[in-house]
Structure formats: structure tokens, C-alpha cells
Amino acid sequence: MQFLAWFNMLLLLPCFSTTKTCFPGCHCEVESFGLFDSFSLTKVDCSGIGSHIVPVPIPLDTSYLDLSSNKLETINESMLTGPGYTTLVSLDLSYNNIAKISSTTFSRLRYLESLDLSHNSLEVLPEDCFSSSPLGDIDLSNNKLLDIALDVFASKGQGKPLNVDLSNNMLSKITRNHEKSIPNIQNLNLSGNRLTSVPNLQGIPLRYLNLDGNPLAKIEKGDFKGLKGLIHLSLSGLHDFRELSPYSFKELPALQVLDLSNNPNLRSLTAEVIFGLNSIQELNLSGTGVSSLPKTVLKYLPSLKSITLRKNIQCFKTIKEGQYHRQIGLTKLGLGAEELLWCKTPCPRPVCRCRDKPLQSAPQNLPTP
């Protein structure tokens, strides 16, 4: 049995061989698998050569093709057709000047799992442009998209879990046709856009959502309705952000990580605001105006493990066991008879000195309402 397990492991181990003959200017690397190199795939790097490169002939067993930084202005189906393209698993078209794609551009890439179109000039995404491929990762960051219908990411089949990066575009509107199939998006990055309100994402099986750096002034009750599976929400650095309405996060029972950092105009966090966050483990309030917490914070956040306050002051939940003594560098938040939050205050001296000699002044208590 041990020999069989060892043999099977060897079959799975990749073995990198030397480069092979490739199109002039490109670099081809063969990745072999199996004990006797019985299976191989080729990675083709044709980046930075120039727009004349397409269409480029590639080996039959090509799995990865890099066409980035070639000043490409157009890309169509005919450029991605031919021997070798049918086996593509990953395609990199980043850092070009692509302004337009059609609904059939990627239609023949039946095995494509990763597509990078970041740092281009795309303004519109046509319907069904990604539906023919079993994509798991789509990077559309740093384009010029103004609005988008999330149906464009729906697969004709069941669809595998999908990561979509739409950061640093010009998006002010996110829509979805509820009569069409639900895109299986689990990770969605909308940071650095022009969203003035939380888009309606109801029904999408999101687990990670990033809205950092948008001009959101407030978060209201019901903004996250229908996102019961969300476990990570980032709302950092929102322009002019001032208010969290009561029960803003009530619809997020599975949320484990909430990042509200770098919102200096956020001054308070009431019990009504954090109500319903029964699964939250990490709460980041660094760089905000929040300097106090409700005394009942642990009652409303039963799963909490740590909170970060002010300038990276980290607080950790501990259980009080009998008598205890004040620890150097720690501040107590009195938040219940048995459960306490101990906060590590930044050391005013180099770490080595703090270890050699206790601090002269006791840390101040963080105020509680």
C-alpha cells in the first residue's frame, strides 16, 4: 500500500523540462507530468512583442498563452482559432489597448478557465461574451467600463464558482436581469469605481465582496439583502462615508470578516448597527473616528475574535478566569462579567527595549459609552 501511494504521488509530480521550438520572439516552456513524462502541457509567452504577433501559431498542447503588452487594439474569434487554441486553459491579454470584444471572441476556447483582460480600454461587454468557456477567473480591472449587467458572467451550464475583478473602472451602475440564470459569482471586486450606493446583488452566491474606494456616503438597512452566504465584506476608504444605518448588516448571518478601515468620518458603531453579525470573527476599524464601543459588543458579536481600532490597536477576546493582573502593553475593555477584550497598544519604543524594560506609564483605558 505504501509503495502504491508513493507511485501515485510520483505520477502527479510535475517535471519541468527545457524550452522547445517556438514562434520567433515567443518563449515556450514545457511542463511534463507523470513518472515517465507521459503527459505534457506548454506555456507560451508572447508578451511585449508587438501587435503584429496575432494570430500567432502555438504548439498543439498549449495550456497557457500570454499576449500581454502587445499594443493590441482588437481581438476577435479568428485570432484565437487554430491548432493549440482548443486546449487553452489560461489566456492573458492584459496591458493592451483593446477597446472592444464581441459575443463570439472567446467562443472556441472551450476549456478556458482563466482570462485576464485588465489594463485595457473596454467600455462595454456584449451579452454572452463569456458563456462558452468554463471560466473560474475573469480580470477586467483597470478598464473604462461605465455600467455592467452581471448576466454577462452567467454560464450556459451550471457554471463553476467564479472570481470577477471589476476594480478601478468607471462603474456607476450594476444591473442584473432576474429572468436570466444567476451567475455563479463567489468573489466580486468592485473597488475603485463610482458607485454611490450598494448595488443590488440579491441572489448571487457571493462569499467575498469588495466595495473599497467608492463614493458611498452611507450604508442602509437592506443594502445587503439576499447575500446570506457572504463571509467577507470590505468597505474601506469610502469617499465621504459618514453613516451606518441601524441593522445595516442584519441580512449577513454568515459574515466572518468586516473591514470598515480608513473611513475617518465614521464616528460611532452602535449596538443597532452591529446587530445580526452573529458569525463575525474579525472587525477592522483602524483609521476611523470610532474610539469607543458599546459595552454589550460581545453580546451582539458572540463569535468575535479580534477588533482593530484607531492606528492598528488590536483587541482580542479572552475569557476571565478568577484573578488576573494588568499586562504591560494591554488595555482592558470591560465588556461583560466573563468575556473581555484585551487591546495591545503600540509600543512607544523599539520592540527590543520594551522587552528589556517595562513601560513607565500605564496604558490608558479606551472609553466605553
Swiss-Prot record:
Residue stretches making up the LRRNT domain: 20-60
Residue positions the entry lists as glycosylated: N76, N189, N284
Tissues in which the protein is found: During embryonic development, expressed in the middle primitive streak and Hensen's node. Expressed in the peripheral region of the developing eye. Expressed in the presomitic mesoderm during somitogenesis in a NOTCH-dependent manner.
Mod. after translation: N-glycosylated.
One GO term (biological process): growth plate cartilage chondrocyte development
Assembly notes: Forms a ternary complex with chordin/CHRD and BMP4.
Xref: PANTHER family: IG(IMMUNOGLOBULIN) AND LRR(LEUCINE RICH REPEAT) DOMAINS, LEUCINE RICH REPEAT CONTAINING 53
Protein name per UniProt: Tsukushi
High-level lineage: Eukaryota, Metazoa, Chordata, Craniata, Vertebrata
